[in-house]
């Protein structure tokens, strides 16, 4: 990877105060390298500039780290090329991650790169529709969607995969109405416990993370 990638990754991690050690950074670089290599043959991401990939895929995935203290399992729904699940596994190698997506070629990449990097990540080629037993998906301490669907569509599905005491996350490309998030959670017996708004440090793109827990 080029110097622009390293600078974007380091500046993003430092600006947002994320707990990412040198070993994790090395894994993140290897993941990004394999992602771009596979992307030449398989459509995994529209972002191909290394610095932009570092910020908008890696750093933006890692923002969940401070909220995962105590979580042992994570389910990444609509994971695509393993985002945010694989970057989180790079930084939290004690975290058992399941990435699911309905597109088999994307999960083939997830499986291959996770094996190559020796990450605790399982890939499942299935579209999550709220039926974990039928789909072969676990209930997890943290259930995550990254811009998969609007919150009122995501929460009823994601709630089905929560382990007892777990947290449901929605990673959003913008700030949304808090009242709408509260209503979406309440309909599923969940309480909105956080809405954190942040800005990516290089592009200044606005982002938000919503968190719900069982009542």
Swiss-Prot record:
The keyword S-adenosyl-L-methionine applies. S-adenosyl-L-methionine binds at residues 78, 83, 128-129, 146. One of its GO terms (molecular function) is rRNA (guanine-N7-)-methyltransferase activity. Its EC number is 2.1.1.170. GO terms for cellular component: cytosol. Disulfide bonds: none annotated. PANTHER family: S-ADENOSYL-L-METHIONINE-DEPENDENT METHYLTRANSFERASES SUPERFAMILY PROTEIN. This is Ribosomal RNA small subunit methyltransferase G. It comes from Anaeromyxobacter dehalogenans (strain 2CP-1 / ATCC BAA-258).
């Amino acid at each position: 990877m080029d110097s622009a990638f390293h600078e974007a990754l380091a500046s993003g991690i430092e600006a947002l105060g994320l707990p990412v050690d040198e070993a994790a950074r090395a894994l993140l670089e290897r993941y990004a390298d394999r992602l771009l290599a596979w992307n030449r043959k398989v459509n995994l991401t529209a972002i191909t500039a290394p610095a932009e990939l570092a910020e908008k895929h890696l750093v933006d995935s890692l923002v969940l780290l401070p909220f995962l203290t105590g979580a042992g399992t994570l389910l990444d729904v609509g994971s695509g090329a393993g985002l945010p699940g694989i970057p989180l596994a790079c930084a939290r190698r004690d975290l058992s991650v399941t990435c699911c997506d309905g597109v088999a070629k994307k999960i083939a990449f997830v499986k291959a790169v996770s094996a190559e990097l020796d990450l605790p990540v399982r890939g499942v080629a299935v579209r999550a529709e709220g039926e974990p037993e039928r789909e072969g998906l676990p209930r997890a301490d943290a259930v995550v969607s990254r811009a998969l669907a609007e919150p009122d569509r995501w929460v009823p599905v994601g709630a089905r995969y929560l382990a007892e005491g777990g947290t449901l996350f929605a990673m959003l490309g913008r700030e949304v109405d808090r009242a709408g998030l509260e209503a979406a959670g309440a309909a599923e017996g969940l309480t909105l416990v956080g809405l954190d708004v942040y800005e990516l440090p290089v592009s200044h793109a606005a982002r938000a993370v919503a968190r719900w827990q069982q009542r």
